[in-house]
């Protein structure tokens, strides 16, 4: 009897330890500097991606994120899968990260991801002079128009999110997509982050994609960071503790989405 009980307890322990593991799942991350901090292989603890992997346990996790990236395109944005930039520029956009991913899948470099996570929006809010049309259109207005044919025709945040997600869903129809709003930022300002996040959330709802709201539910609070750096090193980018907090939160949130 004791032996049977011991075996049962062992099985329960094994099952518990496997909870939240996704050994067969390939994951891809798109985004800006806070995702880029974790490195392309998600092996740097300064980025939330390392902590996400340690909690979510995917088979693979590859980041296509770039520092300075925005959702919002410009009239000069063109498809570019070879250029590299760590600052805000016409082609440093989620649109081109998606096409780099698509090219990697087509050439066999990247397995078809089971999950694609897009966390961006800070730079759209922060560098409004570089993306002057970003907040000039609501999600309702963007979706009332014909889908833009190319990036240079999608120069608002809402139209850029719509176009990018349409490409992702068309090119990777079997992949789950999760959108994440930017965390709060001292430099970007509360109003701008809130406006950007609301548009991303509205677009996600329109498309039918789940959205995780870091701006409201994340551990980084701009007022707190302004007084004392707790989860960031500069008020905008995570330190190791902030990366841990956000990465583990995102892993749990995605698990909760999967369970529904």
Residues of each region from the PLM?
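Short amphipathic alpha-helices and their capping/turn segments at secondary-structure boundaries
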Residues: 20-23, 46-54, 93-112, 165-169
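Oxyanion-hole/transition-state-stabilizing segment in secreted/luminal serine hydrolases
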Residues: 81-152
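Catalytic His-Asp segment of secreted/periplasmic serine-dependent ester chemistry enzymes
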Residues: 40, 79, 182-260
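Serine-esterase "nucleophile elbow" of acetyl-processing enzymes
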Residues: 16-80, 116, 225
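Active-site segments of SGNH/GDSL-like serine hydrolases
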Residues: 119-123, 162-197
């Amino acid at each position: 009897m004791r032996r049977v009980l011991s075996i049962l307890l062992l099985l329960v322990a094994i099952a518990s330890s496997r909870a939240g593991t996704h050994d067969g799942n390939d994951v891809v991350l798109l985004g800006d500097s806070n995702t880029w901090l974790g490195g392309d292989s998600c092996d740097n603890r300064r980025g939330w991606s390392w902590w996400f992997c340690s909690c979510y346990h995917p088979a693979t996790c590859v980041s296509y994120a770039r520092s300075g990236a925005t959702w919002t395109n410009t009239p000069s944005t063109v498809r570019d899968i070879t250029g590299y930039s760590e600052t805000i520029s016409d082609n440093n956009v989620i649109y081109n990260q998606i096409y780099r991913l698509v090219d990697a899948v087509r050439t066999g470099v990247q397995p078809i991801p089971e999950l694609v996570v897009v966390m961006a929006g800070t730079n759209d809010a922060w560098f409004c002079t570089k993306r002057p049309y970003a907040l000039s259109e609501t999600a309702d207005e963007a979706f009332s128009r014909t889908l833009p044919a190319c990036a240079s025709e999608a120069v608002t945040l809402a139209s850029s999110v719509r176009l990018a997600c349409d490409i992702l869903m068309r090119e990777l129809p079997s992949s789950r997509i999760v959108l994440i709003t930017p965390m709060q930022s001292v430099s970007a300002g509360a109003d701008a982050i809130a406006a950007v996040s609301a548009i991303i959330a509205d677009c996600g709802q329109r498309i039918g994609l789940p959205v995780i709201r870091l701006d409201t539910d994340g551990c980084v609070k701009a007022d707190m960071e302004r007084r004392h750096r707790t989860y960031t090193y500069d008020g905008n980018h995570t330190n190791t503790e902030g990366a841990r907090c956000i990465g583990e939160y995102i892993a749990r949130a995605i698990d909760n989405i999967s369970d529904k």
